[in-house]
Amino acid sequence: ADYILQSRGIIIDFTNKSVINSSLHGCLNIEQFYDKILNWNSIVIEECLDGTLINLYYHDKWKLSTKFSIDTEESKFKSHKTFKELFNEINSIDFDILDKSYTYSFLLQHTEIRNVSLVNVNKLYHLESTNNITGEKVEITIPNIEKPKLLKYRDIINILNVNNLSELIIKTNNLPWTNPGYILYSEDRKYRSKIENPNFIKVLNLVKDQSNLKFLILESLYKKCNIKDLLKYYPEYSTKAVEVNTDFNNYAIKLHKLYIKCKVNNVFVDLEKNFKKTICDVHNLFKDERKKNNQSFKITYNHVCNILRNYDTAYLYSIIYPK
């Protein structure tokens, strides 16, 4: 339903019963979009940019929201800085020229919160503006803030040189992995859809929905076993990958030594909480092997590592990095 798409990201002042923040409408899949916009010539195409959606709105003062947070003063992702701090580092907007009844939607690209596309320069893009009272999209230019490139508009602009959806999909599938694809709009910007680049999605899936870099690398190293792919696209993670691998090995070494001391030499040790279960799991392996009449079986460092690798990532992370 249209009202569901239009409700995406809105913030309501219940006291005054008014919308104080709007956002981009939700995306339709391409079939739904084509049901709404039957004429190819009525479709507007823009470049799709990779970054963080930031909405600027006024409620007693100018405030910022993201897709998942109404308060960027506390919200973070990947960086130790809040979204507001990252925004303010590159903000050059003259707030005096802005309409307090509008929401201004921006895309933030910052080296500290890189998603997939390479970020060499921290930058803001003005995506669109919305009248919070009427819900209409408003055509506004904000000085010194770029907009995404317009690639197709009626028969006036056709930078991509595409004449139908099939041609656009073929072009999208051949884009480099750094390019997300293309955004399609109706002329009134009421409806939008996206043609996604599969090469971009492949890289996105390596890091999707994970802001904890240590967790991401731990999973990549020992569960997904795709660390080479991860570092191919994110070479800046190399130092952290070495650190996480060292932390894993140090934990395994300590666990093996504790096992020898506790279970082989029968020395009492007041175990730290993050070693109690793992010691039991190691000893259970020993007992299982002995039950098979494998009387020469001994627990080695490699056995310990294999046990750790079989834990799910969340538990493995919790014992290597206890709070």
Protein language model features and the residues they cover:
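Core nucleotide-handling region used for phosphoryl-transfer chemistry
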Residues: 1-323
